[in-house]
């Protein structure tokens, strides 16, 4: 417990909340250009090859973003839209690429959860 003199000398520091996606600078999404598209392996106990892209944002930040869904057409110099949201088993990946916008096409033959993967409602067959 500090004395009154100690409190006068230096006041209590308020706890600052840490932003989870600082590269977006308060925006819901940001546009960027892919500088590298590659795969990485997740942490234990998971096993896979997750597709990620290194993206240079319009805000000037260089970030690593996850490419969700099965199959993608993203390559170097692709223009992509990036949203926040981390991938729990990939260290350092705090952003997702939005499918179905700009150069990132939606997931092919997706029937359920289509809005998250940029897929239009399929035509009904008679």
From Swiss-Prot:
GO-annotated biological processes: translation
Q: Is the keyword rRNA processing in the record? A: no
> Where found in the cell?
Plastid, Chloroplast
What keywords would UniProt list here?
Chloroplast, Plastid, Ribonucleoprotein, Ribosomal protein, RNA-binding, rRNA-binding
Q: Which cysteines are joined by disulfide bonds?
A: none
HAMAP family named among the record's database cross-references: Ribosomal_uS12_B
Quaternary state and partners of this protein? Part of the 30S ribosomal subunit.
The entry's protein name is Small ribosomal subunit protein uS12cz/uS12cy
Record the organism: Jasminum nudiflorum
